[in-house]
């Protein structure tokens, strides 16, 4: 009986480890094509202030945060974020937007967004800002675009 219990524990441990190793992978070549296509699209919105692309993943890195400083103060109504996901499983990103004024950085606005290549708006109430800090982490490595 002891050997059967030992085998059951060993098999259970292997199954548990296999379950933990299952991480959704984003096709980074397809994600790069998506970023390139989005960047090549002309932005003709009169309220457009800028855009940035972040390489995000499960950990904070230098490539998962960007600060956009504007030449002159601008009034922002929203910031749109979009990230590329996976066809097999849902990929999400936690996005933090911090507004920068002449008084310093404000409190971060944090949103969880689905990485479905569609824009998700973060409302900033028409505030006048000198810059924006966007930071994100995602459930797996992907690209996030902020405009």
Predicted regions and their residues:
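Bacterial N-terminal signal peptides that target proteins for export
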Residues: 1-9
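Extracellular/mature segments of secreted proteins
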Residues: 3, 27-28, 90-95, 108, ...
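C-terminal motif of bacterial Sec signal peptides marking the signal peptidase cleavage site
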Residues: 15-19
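Sequence contexts marking disulfide-bonded cysteines in secreted/extracellular proteins
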Residues: 21, 82-84, 114-116
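Transition segment at domain starts
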Residues: 22-71, 108-110
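Extracellular and analogous surface-interaction loops
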Residues: 58-60, 65-77, 101-102, 121-128
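Noncatalytic modules at the cell exterior or secretory-pathway interfaces
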Residues: 74-81, 120-142, 146-147
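Short, surface-exposed beta-strand/strand-loop-strand elements in extracellular ectodomains
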Residues: 88-106, 144-147
């Amino acid at each position: 009986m002891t050997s059967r219990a030992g085998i059951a524990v060993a098999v259970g441990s292997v199954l548990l480890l296999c379950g933990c190793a299952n991480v959704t992978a984003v096709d980074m070549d397809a994600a790069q094509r998506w970023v390139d296509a989005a960047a090549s699209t002309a932005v003709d919105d009169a309220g457009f202030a800028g855009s940035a692309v972040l390489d995000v993943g499960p950990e904070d890195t230098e490539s998962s945060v960007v600060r956009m400083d504007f030449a002159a103060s601008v009034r922002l109504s929203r910031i749109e974020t979009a990230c590329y996901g996976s066809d097999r499983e849902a990929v999400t990103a936690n996005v933090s937007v911090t507004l920068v004024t002449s008084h310093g950085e404000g409190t971060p606005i944090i949103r969880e967004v689905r990485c479905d290549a569609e824009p998700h708006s973060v409302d900033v109430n028409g505030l006048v800002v000198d810059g924006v800090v966007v930071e994100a982490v995602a459930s797996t490595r992907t690209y996030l675009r902020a405009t």
